[in-house]
UniProtKB/Swiss-Prot annotation:
Signal peptide: none annotated. The gene is murA. One of its GO terms (molecular function) is UDP-N-acetylglucosamine 1-carboxyvinyltransferase activity. Its EC number is 2.5.1.7. Pfam families: EPSP_synthase. This is UDP-N-acetylglucosamine 1-carboxyvinyltransferase. NCBIfam families: murA, PRK09369.1. The modification 2-(S-cysteinyl)pyruvic acid O-phosphothioketal is found at C116. It catalyses: phosphoenolpyruvate + UDP-N-acetyl-alpha-D-glucosamine = UDP-N-acetyl-3-O-(1-carboxyvinyl)-alpha-D-glucosamine + phosphate. Keywords: Cell cycle, Cell division, Cell shape, Cell wall biogenesis/degradation, Cytoplasm, Peptidoglycan synthesis, Pyruvate, Transferase. GO terms for cellular component: cytoplasm. Disulfide bonds: none annotated.
């Protein structure tokens, strides 16, 4: 099993290219289920979750071909409607094949999902929304069995929470439903807009992205398209924290300020400067990090996927900070590992109090989920001495070439195999 060895204390300078968004690329691949024609996606990140989604689509009878560097061609007839446990258990996003299978094949059998061990992440909203569109759903032996023998029918769906996954599943299902569908309290994340733009390029009729209410006029069929996956705003924010925690100066090539409003505002409150340039975002820090209070919220609020990275940075900031997690349960699993490195973090329910310390110390630590993995890398970059990070397969799910990108900017980091 691979691990990272990090020797901290080096200031990062240089350029890092931001790849395609994991949280968009996965959903755009699933959109390929909605047509027999070819959906050609470019700027697809080379990460483990993309490979898992590829395996899932192939298992459903869809052909997925390499069509160039970071480019996939997806399409074909659906040969199976079962998404099995051995694949779905690896990745939470697998649940998103449910809506497209129902819309196009009128039936689906999808294992209840796995993925990161972050709270319960219930799928109730997905299922209730699909039932509103006319699906019949039964939960049996760990599987979701869904049918819509007469096809899905447009209706009004009000989500009790602006769930990203439920919005995406219902949005894709509604593109082939009969009539008009309203999704009220829809998620507003940039990745939702990316999915809307891709679906519209395939012939869907969707309006309202970013407004909180999506309006979908169903069509009989979708066609193929060429589409580029948006840059990964979470990867961009993560490397911005790397510049912040090391007092560095990084140009994040391809980074877009429009996707990172709350993150940029919070970085600036801590004393990290973010400048828009022609090729991306320049992030640098010359002064002292300052403590701030953060509350995670649905977009356009502060993203839960950036919480762990900011905690690492705030652990060496002046003063006290508080992070309140409102999206997921159990998303402070990185706290004991940070504390092993000398951080002073106490968890009280959904809030974590961080009292900044002058320095962290290298230690053996273990990753617990995707974003927590990178928070420990950040801590290792700032720590005195050597940090060994194990279970980095979590990291490989969502970040491409971490050691290569960081080393090119001056980090002392190496991947080793046991």
């Amino acid at each position: 099993m691979d691990r990272f060895i990090i020797r901290g204390g080096r200031r990062l300078t240089g350029e890092i290219e931001i790849g395609g968004a994991k949280n968009s690329g996965l959903k755009l691949m699933v959109a390929g289920l909605l047509t027999s024609e070819r959906l050609v996606l470019s700027n697809v990140p080379a990460i483990a979750d993309i490979k898992t989604m590829r395996d899932l689509l192939v298992g459903l009878g869809i052909t997925v071909e390499d069509a160039g560097p970071r480019t996939l061609s997806i399409g074909g007839e659906i040969g199976s409607v079962e998404a099995p446990y051995d694949i779905v258990s690896k990745m939470r996003a697998s649940i998103l094949v449910l809506g497209p299978l129902l819309a196009r094949a009128r039936e689906a059998k999808v294992s209840l999902p796995g993925g990161c061990a972050i709270g319960t992440r219930p799928v109730d909203m997905h299922l209730k929304g699909l039932e509103t569109l006319g699906a019949e759903i039964r939960l049996e032996n760990g599987y979701i069995n869904a049918t819509a023998p007469d096809g899905l029918k447009g209706d009004r769906i009000i989500l009790p929470f602006a769930s990203v996954g439920a919005t995406e599943n219902l949005l894709m299902a509604a593109t082939l439903a009969k009539g008009r569908t309203h999704i009220v309290n829809a998620a507003r994340e940039p990745e939702i807009s990316d999915l809307v733009h891709c679906l519209n390029a395939m012939g869907a009729q969707i309006t309202g992205e970013g407004s909180g209410t999506l309006v979908i006029d169903g069509v009989e069929k979708l066609h193929g398209a060429h589409y580029a996956v948006m840059p990964d705003r979470i990867e961009c924010g993560t490397y911005a924290c790397a510049a912040g925690i090391t007092g560095g100066d990084l140009l994040l090539v391809g980074g877009r300020a429009d996707d990172l409003g709350a993150v940029i505002r919070t970085l600036e409150e801590t004393g990290v400067e973010v400048l828009e340039e022609e090729r991306g975002l320049r992030v640098r820090r010359s002064g002292t990090l300052q403590g701030v209070d953060i509350m995670t919220e649905p977009y356009p609020g502060f993203p839960t996927d950036m919480q762990a990275q900011f905690m690492a940075m705030l652990s060496v900031a002046e003063g006290a900070s508080m992070i309140t997690e409102t999206i997921f349960e159990n998303r402070f699993m990185h706290v004991p590992e940070l504390n092993r490195m000398g951080a002073r973090v106490n968890v009280h329910g959904r809030s974590a109090i961080i009292r900044g310390v002058p320095k962290l110390s290298g230690a053996p630590v273990m990753a617990t989920d995707l974003r927590a993995s990178f928070s420990l890398i950040l801590a290792g970059l700032a720590a005195e001495g050597e940090t060994q990070l194990s279970r980095i397969y979590h990291l490989d799910r969502g970040y491409e070439g971490v050691d290569r990108k960081l080393a090119a900017c001056g980090a002392d980091i190496a991947r080793v195999s046991d």
